[in-house]
């Protein structure tokens, strides 16, 4: 895996995690 692929994976993971936290926050509170 090269650095560009690793960068895209980390960005997508962070984006997915932030959306999941927003949805969980709305459902939790």
Curated annotation (Swiss-Prot):
Keywords: Electron transport, Membrane, Photosynthesis, Thylakoid, Transmembrane, Transmembrane helix, Transport
Domain of life: Bacteria
One CC-aspect GO term: cytochrome b6f complex
Main location (coarse class): membrane
Isomerase among keywords: no
GO biological process entries: cytochrome complex assembly; photosynthesis
Membrane-topology annotation of the record: Single-pass membrane protein
TM regions (residue ranges): 3-23
InterPro entries in the cross-refs: Cytochr_b6-f_cplx_su8_sf (IPR036143), Cytochrome_b6-f_cplx_su8 (IPR005497)
Subcellular location: Cellular thylakoid membrane
GO terms for MF: electron transporter, transferring electrons within cytochrome b6/f complex of photosystem II activity
Pfam families cross-referenced by the UniProt entry: PetN
Protein task: Component of the cytochrome b6-f complex, which mediates electron transfer between photosystem II (PSII) and photosystem I (PSI), cyclic electron flow around PSI, and state transitions.
Family stated for the protein in its record: Belongs to the PetN family.
Matches recorded under HAMAP family: Cytb6_f_PetN
SUBUNIT field: The 4 large subunits of the cytochrome b6-f complex are cytochrome b6, subunit IV (17 kDa polypeptide, PetD), cytochrome f and the Rieske protein, while the 4 small subunits are PetG, PetL, PetM and PetN. The complex functions as a dimer.
NCBIfam families recorded: PRK14747.1
Record's protein name: Cytochrome b6-f complex subunit 8
């Amino acid at each position: 895996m090269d650095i560009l692929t690793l960068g895209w994976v980390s960005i997508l993971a962070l984006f997915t995690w932030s959306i999941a936290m927003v949805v969980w926050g709305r459902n939790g509170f």
